[in-house]
Amino acid sequence: MRDWVVRTEALRKQFGALTAVHGLDLTIARGEVFGLLGPNGSGKTTTIRMLCGLVLPTSGTATVAGFDITHDAEKVRRRIGYMSQRYGLYDELTVQENLRFYASVYGLVGRAREERLREHVERLGLNARLTQRAGTLSGGWKQRLGLACATAHHPDLVFLDEPTAGVDPAARRTFWETIYDLAKGGTTVLVTTHYMDEAERCQRLAFLSRGHLIGVGTPAEIVQQFGATSVEDVFVMLQKRDEQSVAS
């Protein structure tokens, strides 16, 4: 039996008359690199907020790391990490101070915290920058530090929301190598991105359109399902369809 870190059944979220997510059925395995894709307004952000335990679903169920997002939201939040495209760093703090702060927020203290951070710093190559203020780091190093902060507590699941926006191609490539290292260690990675070359690096993808799940599978399976030539073609197709739907 697969070890599902995320499992949703008929998950639905309504804001007044607007249904943002319609009956989402989704499973994501431990150690999987999973892409959640779709045009703006497709329901990605609402889905992530529900899975983080920040927004309650209107109906349906979901578990993250074995805990119900409605009844065990606090336990869910202790087992996830989240990194936004702005990285969530404190510019006036040093690299080491940012790491210690986030580790403490996630409940790591004392020797356990220092041992975990030492291991993490070595893995992400941050040793030489521990005393540098975060605000003076380049985009690529901020990205690396943001990931280190989001995963300092060794979460079961980490959400990466447009993590490589505004970062040069070399830094993006290095970042994806780090993502796969995390996955090999058992951390499930859920990525949202508008870079379709990055989407094709995911092991599986889910496409949302106007709150509906319309495709799940490997990049090759998604391309075949939509009769397209690439994942980018699928994205453009859905974007145009959504724009036409809104216009009509």
Where are these regions (language model features)?
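Conserved ABC ATPase signature
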Residues: 92, 133-137
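Conserved ABC ATPase "signature" region
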Residues: 100, 104, 109-129
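Conserved catalytic motifs of ABC-family nucleotide-binding domains
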Residues: 154
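Catalytic Walker B motif of ABC-type/P-loop ATPase nucleotide-binding domains
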Residues: 158-162
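ABC ATPase "signature
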Residues: 216-217
